[in-house]
């Protein structure tokens, strides 16, 4: 079971971003990153951090360690804050944890929420952090727009909308 997860993304051509998952038996696999930094064609740097739910009993049985997600996310955000223009968090923690994270870490610009399959048709803002959620069963696709002013180094607007997939061509 340990090796199955350890080698799951060996051939992936993308980063797997999970800041609170660690291999217990050996070094973390090369594909496992606490964060990644993306750069747009306009030079905007976007830090992306991700975390999974604290299912420690499940991961322990597989030989993996999962740590307290909010603490780990906040630590990564502190590391990223001076390196990037925008910070996005991919959260598989659930709406309650996302709301607590938004209260504790206003440096995050957007939290992409999952786990509880909540639906925010136009996002939900807490403490300046935009929370998103697209429900379940692939019913909706989320569309996030961030308007960033390069002169001031500030986000001017951020908004989410969800599109009902049944209405797409």
Residue ranges and their predicted role:
Residues 1-168:
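Acidic, metal/ion-coordinating pockets
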């Amino acid at each position: 079971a340990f090796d199955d997860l350890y080698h799951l993304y060996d051939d992936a051509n993308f980063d797997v971003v999970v800041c609170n998952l660690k291999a217990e038996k050996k070094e973390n696999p090369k594909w496992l990153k606490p964060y990644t930094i993306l750069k747009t064609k306009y030079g905007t740097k976007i830090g992306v951090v991700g975390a999974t739910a604290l299912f420690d009993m499940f991961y322990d049985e597989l030989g993996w360690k999962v740590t307290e997600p909010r603490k780990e996310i906040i630590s990564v955000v502190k590391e990223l804050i001076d390196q990037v223009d925008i910070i996005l968090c991919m959260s598989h923690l659930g709406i309650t944890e996302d709301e607590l994270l938004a209260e504790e870490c206003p440096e995050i610009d957007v939290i992409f929420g999952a786990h509880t399959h909540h639906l925010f048709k136009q996002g939900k803002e807490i403490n300046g952090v935009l929370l998103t959620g697209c429900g379940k069963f692939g019913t909706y696709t989320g569309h996030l727009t961030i308007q960033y002013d390069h002169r001031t180094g500030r986000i001017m607007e951020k908004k989410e909308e969800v599109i009902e997939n049944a209405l797409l061509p």
